[in-house]
């Protein structure tokens, strides 16, 4: 009988203990404005904040050791050399993330925004892809599929907000004149062909002298094109492609590549100034592209693996303004919108439950994946 009573008491204690564990994880941590912040969204915001801190870690700091890393000090602004403890930084960035999420939801609704069924399906599909790829990391941090779906819809709403605020029929529309000026002066419409700096069969890399020869040959072809370039963008693109195709056999000969020049793939891209720095990583290559006048061509080594022959074309001769509007608005106004959302989110009434948030501490973050992401 005593054994049965003891067993019953143990079972009861286990049941109470399990119930306590379930109840210790809140469904919500409160609201910002009228937007409810679920515990999952809080954990996602906190996990993203931790990843930002990890990106700022020095080579001697190990962000995979969460408890010790939270006590470390990181430099949060390289220009001012401002520092903060990781725990403080994560707390601040978590709140900023939540304020931005709430601001997006609130502004989107206030401006009459509504995602289409197709847009919602797109966001949900991407969320499922993220869970398939990073699900173990998300689950280890208490982040489920529904939370990731909500997050992806918030991101999509922020994109739609650009048009709701700055579009033709937006709250503060950007004029066609301003948009045209930005497209012509701040964006780079390139037609280009990439040339590998290695033999495409043996993968033997070109040495420095071979690279120099290839650039000399390519630049010679571009220098011959430039003085005789036509007046219109379409004609410039055609003449550039002819000049580039003509020199490809000589470039391929340097690395003994047997590819057919006729199979070379010419592409076009509309790039922002920041895109140039991201895409053209070899020294001086981004500045060489920036220096191009409309219709002018050049050759650059843009990475360790390839060189490029490129011509800058007038975007509005290649595409209609409406076709470029969303890309231009995104580049022109995204930073301004993000700043406005951050300020607006901070101004909304905060009704966050510190007790609930204390049950979701940063020290419980699991950071064992170098490839973890929140879709940003």
Could you say what each language-model-derived stretch is?
Residues 1-9:
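Positively charged n-region of N-terminal signal peptides that target proteins for export
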Residues 23-143:
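N-terminal targeting/tethering segments
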Residues 23-25, 138-216, 276-376:
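PPIase-associated folding chaperone regions across multiple families
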Residues 47-54, 95-116, 125-139, 153-170, ...:
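Sec-exported extracytoplasmic/periplasmic mature domains
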Residues 220-283:
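Peptidyl-prolyl cis-trans isomerase
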């Amino acid at each position: 009988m005593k054994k049965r009573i003891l067993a019953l008491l143990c079972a009861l204690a286990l049941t109470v203990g399990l119930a306590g564990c379930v109840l210790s994880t809140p469904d919500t941590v409160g609201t910002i404005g009228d937007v409810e912040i679920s515990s999952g969204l809080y954990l996602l915001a906190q996990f993203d904040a931790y990843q930002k801190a990890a990106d700022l870690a020095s080579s001697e700091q190990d962000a995979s050791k969460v408890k010790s890393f939270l006590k470390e000090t990181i430099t949060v602004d390289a220009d001012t050399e401002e520092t903060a403890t990781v725990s403080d930084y994560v707390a601040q960035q978590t709140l900023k993330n939540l304020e931005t999420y709430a601001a997006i939801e609130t502004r989107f609704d206030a401006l009459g925004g509504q995602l289409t069924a197709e847009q919602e399906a797109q966001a949900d599909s991407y969320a499922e892809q993220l869970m398939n790829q990073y699900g173990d990391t998300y689950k280890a941090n208490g982040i489920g599929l529904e939370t990731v779906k909500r997050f992806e819809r918030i991101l999509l709403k922020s994109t739609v907000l650009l048009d709701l605020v700055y579009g033709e029929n937006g709250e503060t529309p950007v004029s066609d004149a301003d948009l045209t000026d930005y497209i012509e002066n701040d964006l780079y419409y390139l037609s280009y062909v990439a040339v590998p700096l290695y033999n495409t069969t043996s993968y033997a890399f070109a040495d420095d002298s071979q690279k120099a020869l290839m650039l000399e040959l390519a630049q010679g072809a571009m220098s011959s094109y430039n003085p005789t370039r036509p007046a219109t963008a379409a004609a410039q693109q055609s003449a550039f492609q002819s000049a580039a195709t003509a020199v490809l056999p000589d470039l391929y000969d340097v690395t003994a590549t047997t590819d057919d020049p006729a199979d070379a793939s010419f592409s076009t891209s509309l790039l922002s100034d920041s895109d140039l720095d991201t895409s053209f990583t070899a020294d001086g290559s981004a500045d060489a592209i920036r220096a191009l006048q409309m219709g002018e061509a050049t050759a650059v080594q843009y990475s360790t693996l390839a060189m490029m022959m490129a011509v800058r074309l007038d975007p509005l001769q290649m595409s209609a303004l409406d076709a470029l509007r969303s890309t231009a608005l995104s580049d022109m106004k995204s930073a301004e919108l993000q700043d406005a959302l951050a300020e607006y989110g901070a101004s909304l009434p905060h009704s966050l439950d510190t007790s609930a948030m204390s049950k979701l501490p940063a020290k419980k973050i699991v950071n064992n994946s170098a490839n973890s992401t929140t879709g940003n």
